[in-house]
Amino acid sequence: DFSLMIDYLRGRSSKGYELFGAHFVWENNQSQVRFAVYAPQAKAVSLIGDFNAWNPDATPMKPVADSGIYELFVPGLGVGQLYKFAITTHTGTILFKADPYAFSAEYRPGTASVTADIRGFKWNDSKWMESRAGTDPVKAPISIYEVHLGSWKKKNRPEKDGYYTYMEAAHELADYVLEMGYTHVELMGIAEHPYAVVQINNRQSVVLIFHK
């Protein structure tokens, strides 16, 4: 929705992740992916990916009025497709950029964004949310355990460099934290980053290597 995009750009909304990026939608009686990016200084923007041979001329995006927003609906795409934005500057230079609002990203050394359908995700933390509402975090004691999942513990397996998945680490980490007397966990480097150092390039995508 254009008005919602403008509200976000003017600081009246905090839900940019609902407006920008790649969203699976039902449009014109078919499944499509809606791409949107904010590039106010661009001369033109196009969509590139494994579906068009990374050709900057194949899939141009449409500017939304003079807002600096570029948008495009693409039918026939599936989950797990690689893509980037090809941004043409006013000097004619073409820059290939990952989507800052992507919900998934390619594992290093690749730097592409990845289409992901999050519509079917079901939250199951209602009991915890209810219990949290009955506490006063300002008055309650707090002791934070800061941890990087990739180096906290590893398995003796070659795939994924031995990393635990989120689900595998959840119970062991919770048991350890409770045993040590901590009240909270702060996960380091959980937003996607393309290199071993934590240089975040995508705040909407959690690190892929721990997914499965």
Regions found by a protein language model. Give the residues of each.
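Aromatic- and acidic-residue-enriched carbohydrate-binding clefts of CAZyme catalytic domains
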Residues: 143, 159-162, 193-212
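Catalytic domains of carbohydrate-active enzymes, especially glycoside hydrolases
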Residues: 171-193
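The feature marks proteins involved in alpha-glucan
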Residues: 1-34, 64-146, 151-159, 168, ...
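Short proline/glycine-enriched turn/loop motifs at strand-loop junctions of beta-rich domains
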Residues: 38-45
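Conserved, mostly hydrophobic/aromatic
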Residues: 37, 85, 147, 177, ...
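Solvent-exposed serine/threonine-rich low-complexity stretches and specific carbohydrate-binding patches
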Residues: 57-65
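Short beta-strand elements bearing conserved aromatic residues within extracellular beta-rich modules
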Residues: 45-47, 83
